[in-house]
Curated annotation (Swiss-Prot):
It catalyses: Hydrolyzes single-stranded DNA or mismatched double-stranded DNA and polynucleotides, releasing free uracil. It comes from Albidiferax ferrireducens (strain ATCC BAA-621 / DSM 15236 / T118) (Rhodoferax ferrireducens). GO terms for cellular component: cytoplasm. Transmembrane segments: none annotated. The gene is ung. Belongs to the uracil-DNA glycosylase (UDG) superfamily. UNG family. PANTHER family: URACIL-DNA GLYCOSYLASE. GO terms for molecular function: uracil DNA N-glycosylase activity. Its EC number is 3.2.2.27. Keywords: Cytoplasm, DNA damage, DNA repair, Hydrolase. It comes from the Bacteria. It is an enzyme of class 3 (hydrolase). This is Uracil-DNA glycosylase.
Amino acid sequence: MFASDVPRLTGWAPERWPVAADWRPVVDRFLTSETGRALERFVRARLAGGAVIYPQQPLRALALTPLAQVKVVILGQDPYHGPGQAEGLAFSVAPGVRPPPSLCNIFREIARDPLLSPGNLIPHGDGSLVAWARQGVLLLNSCLTVEEGQPASHAGRGWEALTDEVVKAVASIDNPVVFLLWGAHAQAKQRLIAATARQGGRAAADHLVLTANHPSPLSARRPPLPFLGCGHFGLANAYLLQHGCAPIAW
């Protein structure tokens, strides 16, 4: 594949970024806010300056996983910044792309989780996690765009305001939800989740929040909360079953 063939963001065009109907009010409020308009100006300027920006569909997580169907939330930081990697879902890579080290550790943890039976597993021929998203796993990055070869290049430019509202919307729903918070960046959302639940008259315990280190090889085995051995995937399914919900086929 030539560089020019790699899917990328070609313009600021939210009308071409589909989202599920129940996410539309959240997205529209953000897009018309001053923060949303400032982000639009920034992205347009970077594109005009020749920046290569990924992914092609920044809001894809909100298209594949409607709010009413969310069972599990996995929070990432920002999209992969290599050509052809990002597909708009946290930790997921486009079909045919070799899974990065963090995703390899995620698959390794699933394979060793003693609470998961073969019926809870699906074969992964590549690193795409679209099948999870379609089962109700919201794979949400805090920042939804990135420039090629420049991690965190769009951090602090406004996307975080939208993704915080997404987290708050999930924390407000009546359905039981599991939040998997890996690493300090994701765990910073724990207070937001609890505060939102309380504001809605829910006990924080109504949702299950599990924390561990980030699955990156740099931290996956580091105490006191190593990712490898955390058992989060089996615990999530046990919680869903306890609340009358179908488990996730990981």
